């Protein structure tokens, strides 16, 4: 499991421009991530997803996020997410640790 504090810094630097994590957070360019873990792709209420995201059909968890965050466009071809990905495994683990905590508390 990664480091939550390091993950928060990564989120602020690389994700917060397009995503929020708070329960009452608004959608931005990307969806609000509250309740992410255990939810299927393309299912955040009120966000307009591509058909690729809606039909991927996987459930978000540590393993699926770890793979997705390395190269989002390879994992879900046709996604609107224009982020290139995080290549360093430890950075992905830190970000996932932060997301797990921040999207459920």
From Swiss-Prot:
Ranges in a coiled coil: none
Protein localization: Mitochondrion intermembrane space
A GO term, aspect molecular function: electron transfer activity
Presence of keyword Transport: yes
Residues that, per the record, bind heme c: 15, 18-19, 81
GO cellular component, one term: mitochondrial intermembrane space
The protein's name in its UniProt record: Cytochrome c, somatic
Keywords: Acetylation, Electron transport, Heme, Iron, Metal-binding, Mitochondrion, Respiratory chain, Transport
Organism: Xenopus tropicalis
Acetylation as UniProt keyword: yes
